[in-house]
Amino acid sequence: MHTTQKDTTYTKIFVGGLPYHTTDSSLRKYFEVFGDIEEAVVITDRQTGKSRGYGFVTMADRAAAERACKDPNPIIDGRKANVNLAYLGAKPRIMQPGFAFGVQQLHPALIQRPFGIPAHYVYPQAFVQPGVVIPHVQPAAAAASTTPYIGYTGAAYAQYSAAAAAYEQYPYAASPAAAAGYVAAGGYGYAVQQPITAAAPGTAAAAAAAFGQYQPQQLQTDRMQ
């Protein structure tokens, strides 16, 4: 007479994450609170006889198996285990909210700007004087600005520009108009940069007084011959 094998699809439980010291009896002791147990087996290593970290428990009925699988964080022999119906396999690990990709949300205003830098920290365009680089700032914006990285007002920039226009006289140029091109002197050519447009007459006079110690160099007739 052949015995019919009982269907264990909904009663056989896979138990993973077991410590090395877990035995059949300790595994049975944990699951017997959920109902009657038909079998509890820990898979062991043949050479060492210690647990390989998983086992199987067959409950007497489906309801008992469902109760045993309800706990999302079962602790067996002091270690968190993975309990699920055997035909479903091991449960996927659930990431804790505190460990899920800790990327801080950026403010929309920072995302719209390049590299997430506030607008007043972006380097402005620059005017290039001979040997001097002066950041270009509008007078109204410079007066209203409170950032510590801009220590000059619009009037100071205009004053410096006017002084630079009065000071930058080139020793190899006969006049400022001739400085726009190449001036030949003694068989050599000198590339001369044209200074930017001077500021208002009143500002230029004040700048010339402030920078009076810088006198234009006098042209020597013997160099121009």
UniProtKB/Swiss-Prot annotation:
Cross-referenced CDD domains: RRM_RBM24_RBM38_like (cd12384)
Span of domain RRM: 11-88
UniProt key word Phosphoprotein: no
Source organism, top-level taxon: Eukaryota
Keywords: Cytoplasm, Differentiation, mRNA processing, mRNA splicing, Nucleus, RNA-binding, Translation regulation
GO cellular component labels: cytoplasm; cytosol; nucleus
GO MF annotations in UniProt: mRNA 3'-UTR AU-rich region binding; mRNA 3'-UTR binding; mRNA CDS binding; pre-mRNA intronic binding; sequence-specific mRNA binding
SMART domains with a match to the protein in the record: RRM (SM00360)
GO biological process: one example: positive regulation of skeletal muscle fiber differentiation
InterPro entries per the UniProt record, alphabetical: Nucleotide-bd_a/b_plait_sf, RBD_domain_sf, RNA-binding_reg, RRM_dom
Family matches, as Pfam families: RRM_1 (PF00076)
Primary localization: nucleus
Protein's cellular compartments: Nucleus; Cytoplasm
RNA-binding as UniProt keyword: yes
Function summary: Multifunctional RNA-binding protein involved in the regulation of pre-mRNA splicing, mRNA stability and mRNA translation important for cell fate decision and differentiation. Plays a major role in pre-mRNA alternative splicing regulation. Mediates preferentially muscle-specific exon inclusion in numerous mRNAs important for striated cardiac and skeletal muscle cell differentiation. Binds to intronic splicing enhancer (ISE) composed of stretches of GU-rich motifs localized in flanking intron of exon that will be included by alternative splicing.
Domain text: The RRM domain is necessary for mRNA stability and mRNA translation regulation.
Name of the protein: RNA-binding protein 24
Organism: Gallus gallus (Chicken)
Lineage, highest ranks first: Eukaryota, Metazoa, Chordata, Craniata, Vertebrata
